Regions:
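C-terminal regulatory/effector modules of DNA-binding transcriptional regulators
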Residues: 177, 181-272
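Interdomain hinge/linker segments and adjacent boundary elements that couple functional modules
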Residues: 2-38, 44-48, 54-55, 59-173, ...
Length: 272
């Protein structure tokens, strides 16, 4: 619930609706503001303890202003941020002006997880494979991943992701027919209203997803053989967001997609 009492109790957006300058700044702001709320502090009260104006602290808590090294240290102390967590926030603060991310294999996925956590929804587009959130464990294993590396998801309620699949993704030479049939059935029953098929004539494009974050431009995530590339600058995401709009316009309805998937599953002998 919003706090009451001062004009700066709850961080506010700029007039254009975009708060944070960069995604790193947004992650810092969200973590600090979550800690502030956990301690039941208004921004005015915290600003007083930091000897900052409420307006200045409000900009920090929305990511519109990156805290200095001294300020982030003081905020972590006052908000009782876990000491083991502080170096991560210090790094994000130091790199807050950067607008692209490359997370290489072995580097961990905590940064990606943090970005996913602040996203409200995501839209996936994949021309060749079933996106990971929709895969059965058997399908994932057939692609060469270790057993136990993936669990078949339960139907999502409420669904927050949307999926645009190219027909090419519904066949794969490495996937046995029975596994693909099970996968097709799984698509029919797992969040069926979130999946839409593209026409076969739609030009294939390397897979990606667009993360939609409140009060922030669309963020593009590309998984390139385990290396995660994250783009946030509108200049660098424009080609992907334009393609996504075109794909969304061209895609079949969810109902038509569900019928198509059911028919394909029936041809494999898995419907009964």
């Amino acid at each position: 619930m919003p706090e009451h009492g001062t004009a700066f109790d709850t961080p506010r957006a700029d007039g254009n609706g975009v708060r944070a300058k960069t995604l790193r700044g947004l992650l810092v702001a969200r973590e600090l503001d979550t800690a502030r709320l956990a301690r039941s502090l208004t921004t005015r009260e915290l600003a007083g303890q930091m000897t900052m104006s409420p307006a200045m602290l409000n900009r920090v808590m929305t990511g519109r202003r990156v805290p200095t090294a001294l300020e982030i240290g003081g905020l972590c102390g006052l908000l009782d941020i876990d000491p083991a967590r502080r170096p991560h926030l210090y790094r994000l603060t130091a790199d807050a002006d950067l607008t692209e991310w490359i997370i290489r294999p072995g580097a961990g996925t905590s940064a990606l997880g943090a970005i996913e956590e602040v996203a409200d929804t995501a839209t996936w587009l994949d021309p060749l494979l079933i996106p990971r959130p929709l895969r059965t464990a058997a399908y994932h294993h057939a692609l060469g991943h270790p057993i136990g590396d993936h669990q078949s998801p339960e139907p999502a309620a409420p669904p927050t992701d949307r999926f645009l699949l190219h027909p090419r993704a519904l066949t794969h030479p490495a996937i046995p027919a029975d596994v693909m049939g099970e996968q097709l059935l799984h698509l029919c029953h797992t969040a069926p209203n979130t999946i839409r098929l593209l026409p076969a004539t739609f030009p294939p494009h390397p897979g990606f997803r667009v993360l939609h974050i409140d009060h922030f431009p669309p963020v593009v995530h590309i998984d390139h053989h385990g290396t995660h590339v994250i783009l946030e600058s509108p200049d660098s995401t424009a080609a992907h967001t334009t393609l996504l709009r075109a794909a969304t316009t061209a895609a079949a309805t969810a109902e038509h997609t569900r019928r198509t998937l059911t028919d394909l599953a029936a041809r494999t002998g898995t419907v009964g």
